[in-house]
């Protein structure tokens, strides 16, 4: 969006908020889960213009016109959409388009995907196909460049092998936000040249580094892994995993899926230990 279009969009939101123009959609009488303040605020109305929220408050009746769609929340909770912090579309045996079609009705409004499975088969062109398809979705689909292709060298027959040069190229693509989960955690703390070169390319491009420390040892190897650059991690399963990652400056990802049920154990870092929830991520 250029500056002119942004200014026009903002003026349109202002007009709706002031009651000078009708909203496209109004949701009335919900319980607003305000993530900014940590409150649940009953009796809240929301007015929407286009793809943006123009008004959130106790009474949006001034924004309702003859063509405004009105939804009665009747006390239901109004929560922000889920930004799924880490997932693999290919694991669902679906394209990006069909995956989005499946999850949007359940409240997912953005996804952070690591297409290392398609990269294992098609290499860099496969990643580019995922990036291009992600760009035309109705929600934000952010793509990370796979860091470990193949994922198990010597134990599989992949269709491609990717390294620092491919990572450097991918970092120039619109839609690539960083380096995907660094699954080769021993390579990080043992100083593997290829692994550190990939991390270096991503950092040079100003991108984020995804983590994957799948070990219970929170001693020197864990500290060395964090020092190597990964910024988040979804592999924690215990309360102490969440605490250690948070204290070391990482963003702990609390994972809930068909194979992993790690939220209940790790969320105790917030509910029982009182740690700041703002750096925790759901995936």
Cite the ranges covered by each PLM segment:
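Active-site neighborhood of phospho(di)ester-bond hydrolases with catalytic His/Asp-centered motifs
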Residues: 79-85, 113-116, 144, 180-182, ...
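Divalent-metal coordination cores built from histidine and acidic residues
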Residues: 2-17, 21-22, 97-208
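Short, ordered loop/turn segments at secondary-structure junctions
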Residues: 58-59, 115-118, 146-148, 184, ...
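Histidine/acidic residue-rich metal-binding segments in metalloenzymes
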Residues: 126, 161-181, 187-254, 260-282
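Divalent metal-coordination and catalytic microenvironments
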Residues: 30, 46, 51, 75, ...
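Di-metal (Zn2+ and/or Mg2+/Mn2+) metal-binding site signature of metallo-dependent hydrolases
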Residues: 76-99
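Histidine-rich, glycine-flanked metal-binding segment
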Residues: 2-80
């Amino acid at each position: 969006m250029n500056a002119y279009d942004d200014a026009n969009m903002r003026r349109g939101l202002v007009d709706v908020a002031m009651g000078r123009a009708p909203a496209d959609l109004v949701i009335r009488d919900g319980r607003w889960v305000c993530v900014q303040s940590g409150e649940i605020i009953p009796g809240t109305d929301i007015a929407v213009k286009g793809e943006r929220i123009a008004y959130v408050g106790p009474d949006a009746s001034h924004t309702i016109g003859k063509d405004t769609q009105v939804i009665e929340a009747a006390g239901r909770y109004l929560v922000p959409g889920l930004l799924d912090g880490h997932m693999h579309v290919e694991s669902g045996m679906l394209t990006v388009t069909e995956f989005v079609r499946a999850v949007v009705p359940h409240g997912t409004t953005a996804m952070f995907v690591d297409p290392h499975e398609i990269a294992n088969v098609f290499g860099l062109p496969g990643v580019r196909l995922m990036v291009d398809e992600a760009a035309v979705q109705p929600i934000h689909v952010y793509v990370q460049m796979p860091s470990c292709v193949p994922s198990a060298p010597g134990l599989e027959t992949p269709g491609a092998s990717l390294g620092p040069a491919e990572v450097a190229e991918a970092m120039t693509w619109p839609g690539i936000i960083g380096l995907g989960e660094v699954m080769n955690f021993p390579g990080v703390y043992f100083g593997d040249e290829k692994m550190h070169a990939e991390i270096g390319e991503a950092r040079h491009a100003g991108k984020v580094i995804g983590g994957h420390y799948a070990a219970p040892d929170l001693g020197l190897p864990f500290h060395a892994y964090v020092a190597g650059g990964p910024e988040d991690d979804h592999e924690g399963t215990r309360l102490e995993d969440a605490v250690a990652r948070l204290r070391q400056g990482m963003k702990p990802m609390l994972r809930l899926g068909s194979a992993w049920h790690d939220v209940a154990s790790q969320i105790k870092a917030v509910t029982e230990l009182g740690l700041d929830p703002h750096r925790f991520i759901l995936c």
